[in-house]
């Protein structure tokens, strides 16, 4: 089982979009996948046309076993949902011993090829838990002037977690909201490639199609044309995860 966190402390950089899209592609290709929503906004459920619900809260407080909380949202793809109870969860867990490894321990017995963690935008206890549970991180980054800062912060988090004894690696940096009509996109993409080299994947373009899909409870794979540049960019991400190149 490989656990992959989709993380960047900035909000609105396409973390949830990336987690949903990657998880569904791995499932479409025949792997069993658990998608975990770690954000109190509970944005993952609506992407599948479902209301948010307190799955994460119940799991991490050991109220209900994982198998009973998972919702099958597509063939081979199970969702552990979240909602506003996740905010309360952070306060309750703050008093626990070994509090940054609660998620890792809860997922240790999970039966899946991949676990994909969609994280929230703040550096908090659940963010620490995601990094302590993850083997690898995918960092989506909007190619604006804050792009480099977002990735640098994520790299610092990875170093911190490694220094505390948990092996976790950056698997891919995914530039998002690429806009061919602005110099800003190009300049910031070039800066990312200069600094992080092959870790940086081809950029996902800004497209209203990607905004429309979740509103209809559909994923990118069910809504975009396979020739669309965003479709191809997300295919490259899956291939990086599967084959490491
Ligand atoms: N490439 C894109 N082009 C246009 N809109 C996008 C793109 N990727 C994501 N979005 C939209 O941008 C918003 C923020 O994306 P989201 O994945 O929720 O980010 P995060 O989880 O980092 O806050 C959502 O409405 C989403 O549908
Ligand atoms: Mg999100």
Language model regions located:
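P-loop NTP-binding core
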Residues: 1-245
